[in-house]
Amino acid sequence: MTYKKTDFVPFSADAQRSIANLEAAYEQLVDIEREQGAMPTSMFWQTKNGKDYLAVKKSTSDSGTTQGPRSPETERQFAEYSAERTRLQVRRASLSALVQDRVKLCRALRLPQLAEQQGRLLRELDLHGLLGYDVLVVGTNAFAAYEMVCGARFPVGNEATEDFDLAWCRGTKVSLAAIASPAPRQAASDRASLMSVLKRIDCTYAINRRKPYQAVNDAGYEVELLAAPSTHPLPNGEAFEPMATLVEQEWLLRGTPVRCVVTTNKPASCPLYVPDPRWMAVHKLWLSLKPERNPAKKGKDARQGHVLLDATRYFLQDSCPMGLDFVLELPPALRDLFTAWAEKSGFDPTNPTA
């Protein structure tokens, strides 16, 4: 199957501006939320033996730690905390309203979106520093990001899905920790585990005993963690046990990942961090031929692989070139698939911009 450039529907200039404005507002909002999360949960005066003492709770489960009796120093500390807390609350409310306004505009322009269930999960992963640093989004949910970065609606590929696939990327070249990007606010060993983030959203999430790489909640919603052999073993604190034999996951840790912000059907917004579209495309083509693959998924895999290669050809040649350097980087199994697509599509890797 081959898709012509006319099969894609480019976003308007207004849509492109709206996407950029939404992303800027979301990033500011999540920065404020992280600042709030880093502050003590509360700070208050408590009386003991007729004297006032300043107490601080670092978290909701904290019983409180005394900072000392009332004095000019503790009063200054309390005043600074109160002022900063108020500042962040006001700023968060303002940015939340701004994000909502920009979400409404993006939805009116019918830009790509995810279901709110996926959106909430992605916001929490981002807030706690896992998205991009420890995990990236793979599978069908990634296609909203590919449409956004291409600036065009795909004829196929971005299809509804009832599950959520993540791939482990900590310690790899595609992790934000290895890319020219702000350093993570927490060391890897101090970040929350994937399961702890899921439980913040829904305490009923539990590991599926038959599939230890999968967590399921009481509503039956599934979150799967995939991991390339090179990333094993996972840290001790991770409850997930992904299979160690999925060599094809190595391919999704190549190239240049994509990050963007999309809307959800709540309406709300959420970030996406997904594999390089070139590698995702050939990965999908390979999956469509994998003997062990569920036959019901193979048709979608083939559609997604072909449409993503065509989209990359038409819209991303500057950032994701598919010239000879890329072809030579492909392992033989993927190179044959890419060559077959190129011949059928009339694409010449020696002259990719023709």
Model segments located where?
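Compositionally biased terminal segments of proteins
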Residues: M1-D52, S59-S61, T66-A354
